């Protein structure tokens, strides 16, 4: 469960915190337009989070939905980084953000379904640690790359890391779709495990 989170965390850490710098550097965007872009992005994240459970039903499972949304988001990530026009890069940013963030609640829910209740806190902590490993190193790496080469290598590296995370998620968990969730004990009884 943690390897995909490490890859996504590092991929995000080298690029996502610097979107304001990227848009300023690449397109000389005004602060008010940048603020509007980020506001719309937050709104789309909320809408995507609401739609994600329905998407997992349509696609036949949480893992399928996680992998599909992450892989499609790669197209828009690269569009954002390599577009020649602000409007096209902005569309890429908005769609990448919505799609990539749709997968997070689904992956978290999947992990909790596969974990006995008494271990939920530990699993959440480990997933958070895995995500933050990338954020501990990523900003330094990003700063060095930005100074020497600009943003384009960071977009490529992030796309590769996100793709690796999606492939790992699919490889590790595709066979668990459709399996029953772990039974959870109720207040007065122990769980009954199938034999």
Question: Where in the sequence are the language-model features?
Answer:
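Helix-to-loop junctions at the C-terminal end of transmembrane segments
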Residues: 48-61, 146-147
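Intracellular juxtamembrane helix-capping segments at the cytosolic ends
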Residues: 102-115
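Structural signature of the two symmetry-related core transmembrane helices
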Residues: 64-79, 156-159
């Amino acid at each position: 469960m943690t390897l995909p989170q490490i890859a996504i965390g590092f991929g995000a850490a080298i690029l996502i915190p610097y979107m304001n710098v990227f848009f300023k550097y690449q397109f000389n965007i005004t602060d008010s337009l940048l603020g509007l872009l980020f506001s719309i992005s937050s709104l789309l994240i909320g809408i995507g989070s609401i739609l994600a459970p329905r998407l997992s039903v349509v696609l036949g499972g949480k893992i399928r939905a996680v992998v599909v949304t992450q892989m499609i988001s790669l197209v828009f990530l690269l569009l954002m980084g390599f577009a020649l026009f602000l409007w096209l890069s902005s569309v890429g940013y908005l769609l990448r953000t919505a799609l990539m963030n749709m997968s997070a609640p689904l992956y978290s829910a999947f992990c909790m379904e596969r974990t006995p209740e008494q271990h939920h806190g530990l699993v959440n902590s480990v997933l958070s640690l895995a995500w933050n490993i990338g954020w501990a190193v990523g900003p330094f790496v990003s700063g060095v790359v930005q100074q020497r080469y600009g943003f384009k290598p960071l977009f490529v590296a992030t796309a590769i890391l996100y793709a690796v995370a999606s492939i790992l998620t699919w490889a590790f968990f595709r066979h668990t779709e459709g399996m029953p969730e772990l039974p959870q004990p109720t207040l007065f009884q122990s769980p009954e495990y199938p034999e």
